[in-house]
UniProtKB/Swiss-Prot annotation:
It is a peripheral membrane protein. It comes from Anoxybacillus flavithermus (strain DSM 21510 / WK1). Gene3D superfamilies: ATP synthase delta/epsilon subunit, C-terminal domain (1.20.5.440), F0F1 ATP synthase delta/epsilon subunit, N-terminal (2.60.15.10). GO terms for molecular function: ATP binding; proton-transporting ATP synthase activity, rotational mechanism. It holds the Pfam family ATP-synt_DE_N. The lineage of its organism: Bacteria, Bacillati, Bacillota, Bacilli, Bacillales. GO terms for cellular component: plasma membrane; proton-transporting ATP synthase complex. Belongs to the ATPase epsilon chain family. The keyword Transferase does not apply. Its main location: membrane. This is ATP synthase epsilon chain. Coiled coil: none annotated. The gene is atpC. F-type ATPases have 2 components, CF(1) - the catalytic core - and CF(0) - the membrane proton channel. CF(1) has five subunits: alpha(3), beta(3), gamma(1), delta(1), epsilon(1). CF(0) has three main subunits: a, b and c.
Length: 134
C-alpha cells in the first residue's frame, strides 16, 4: 500500500517522523483523514489526537493545537505541544487535570477561566491518548 511521510514538530523539536498509510486529525473545521496523494491544504488543529495508521497498527500523538500542512507526498504537523502515547506521564497528566478542575471550581475572580479550561482540555486529551480512549 502507498505511504505518506509524516512529521510532527514542536518548538522543542521533532516528536514523530515516519511513513504511514493514513493520517487522521481533528481540525477546527472537523475531522480530517489524509491519504497519499491528497490535495495540498493547510488546516488549524484543535486539541486532540493525531492517529497514524501503518498496516494493522495505529499510533497516537496528543497535540495541543497547531497546524496541519498537507502536500501530495508529505504531511507536516506544527504543534504547540505534542507527545506520543507511550511518552505521556499519566500521573503528571492526572495532576494537571485535577489542578485545572480545582481552579475552575474555585470561581475566583483572579483566575483566568479560559486558560484553566484549555489546561483541562489538554490534560484530558493526554489521558485519553495515553489510555487509547479513541
Amino acid at each position: 500500500m502507498k505511504t505518506i511521510k509524516v512529521s510532527v514538530v514542536t518548538p522543542d523539536g521533532p516528536v514523530y517522523e515516519a511513513d504511514v498509510e493514513m493520517v487522521s486529525a481533528k481540525a477546527q473545521s472537523g475531522e480530517l483523514g489524509v491519504l497519499p496523494g491528497h490535495i495540498p491544504m493547510v488546516a488549524p488543529l484543535e486539541i486532540g489526537a493525531v492517529r497514524l495508521k501503518k498496516g494493522n497498527a495505529t499510533e497516537l500523538v496528543a497535540v495541543s493545537g497547531g497546524f496541519l500542512e498537507v502536500r501530495p507526498d508529505r504531511v507536516t504537523i506544527l504543534a504547540q505541544a505534542a507527545e506520543r502515547a507511550e511518552d505521556i506521564d499519566v500521573a503528571r497528566a492526572k495532576a494537571a487535570k485535577e489542578r485545572a478542575e480545582r481552579r475552575l471550581q474555585a470561581k475566583q475572580e483572579d483566575i483566568d477561566h479560559k486558560r484553566a479550561e484549555l489546561a483541562l482540555r489538554r490534560a484530558i486529551n493526554r489521558l485519553n491518548v495515553a489510555n487509547r480512549n479513541f
